[in-house]
Amino acid sequence: MTKLDSPQFEPFELTAADYAFPMFYAGCTLSFRLKSPEMGIPVLQTAVERITAHLPFLTGIVIPSAVKDGVMEVHPAACGQSGLEDPQCRVRRLPHLCLPPKTASASANKKHGSGMTYDRNECLIVAPLEAATAAQQHPVIRFQINVLADGIIFTLFANHMVIDGTGLGIITEMLASCCQTADNTGSVPELAGAIDREARTRAMLGTIGRREREKVQFEPVAAESAAPDGHQEVHDASLVDCNFRLSADKIRRIRERAQELGIASASEDDIVTAVLWLCMSEFRSHSGAGKEISACTLLRMVNVRRRFHPAVPDNYLGNCYIMIEETLPTTDLSGGAAQASTEEDFLRLIGVVASVLRSRLNRVDDQYVRDHLAQFTHAGDWAHTTIHEPDVAVTSLRGMSVYSLDFGSVLSGIVDFETLPYMNPDGVCTIKPRRVIDPSWEVAVTLSREDMDRLRKNELFRWLVVGESYLHIFQSAQQVTTFA
């Protein structure tokens, strides 16, 4: 689909929930292993066309308002604004590449291969990076079909000021439904009423912070001069990205033992987050102003769709996350772990930290969310907070059902899901979607090379890890991947 036939829609302003994030792009890849990769191209292209026909704002661009300073809007992309060479869904043929062997992600052993070189920019060839480098008009989302020797890597690359991680998951579910419908012509329930649902939800979220916005008087400004003034994210090519598999049995055991000890109830997601916070606090911490005791700050991304009253629809595509900060002295975190001499000590410590996280989450209700988001009334507000400077940041996609989706007779199911490291800063951890067969907790971690080595040597972390590897989306068609 080109800009000439892009669906039209009524422009709309972004909400306070959207301004809680800076202008950056987040991407994920869906890998399909195919005997005839070319056959998958029209299936995915038609699916994208059907989705954008039902949700035309996905073809739009994010630009500053022409009349309201600090306000960003989504508009239809007029011909020439981004150029005809910038299609909604691009096809790129990479016959010299192939998917990693099936055993690479499922059974990587505990040896990391630290002598191996890693280039985090290498995988970015599968992403339409042009969307992120536009000077003024920032596309809402772009797709790229990468055709390899033995399959397809389908990339979704979205503007995080419009679509969050859950939104990408919903779009993936819509894609699957469109692909499995015979000849891509049958009805798709997921698309029915989607545009009305988006409009109603945005109207509700648009009321948050309205009073604060009305208190400030702005002079009308030209759209081209109203560039967003949020924090500028920088892609750091020197960082490394690793995938770790944590034992599902041990995570379950920690939770059960915590309950036996009378520690406040915590979910397994809380347990994994606590583990990452504990282990990384050993080398990622800070000293508060005028304080001798160092502390470690955790930033946890929380999906608040169901914490609103009434709840926001689960399948709303726009931003509906908040960032919750929690800070503890390192003496309570890594210090406590250093003093733990037995497995029982480990279980108790993790349970205690996880209960702190659960207790904080239990306080997040409708009023809490509205008060939190009310501070983000304009695009530049994010830059004036400190929430983007944590020691450790954790977001969870564990509940995303990508591995159970059926993409039809041509594509079948996804063999691998990855988050692209583009713009991922130091200290970010992503709990990845659960696989259908393997219950292990897969976690993607971004750190400096030195800190990654420190994490791998952490005693508690080594006790939990059952497999690890560098981020590995594809390989040379001539290469045989081993984890040694």
From Swiss-Prot:
Pfam families in UniProt: Transferase
Species of origin: Aspergillus hancockii
GO molecular function terms listed in the Swiss-Prot or TrEMBL record: acyltransferase activity
UniProt cross-references to InterPro entries, sorted A to Z: CAT-like_dom_sf, Sec_Metabolite_Acyltrans
Source lineage: Eukaryota, Fungi, Dikarya, Ascomycota, Pezizomycotina
Physiological role: O-acetyltransferase; part of the gene cluster that mediates the biosynthesis of hancockiamides, an unusual new family of N-cinnamoylated piperazines. The NRPS hkm10 and the NmrA-like reductase hkm9 are proposed to convert two molecules of L-Phe to the intermediary piperazine called xenocockiamide A. Xenocockiamide A is then converted to hancockiamide D via a series of hydroxylations and O-methylations.
Assigned EC number: 2.3.1.-
Protein name: O-acetyltransferase hkm3
Family matches, as PANTHER family: FAMILY REGULATORY PROTEIN, PUTATIVE (AFU_ORTHOLOGUE AFUA_3G14730)-RELATED, TRICHOTHECENE 3-O-ACETYLTRANSFERASE
Top-level EC class: transferase
Family listed: Belongs to the fumigaclavine B O-acetyltransferase family.
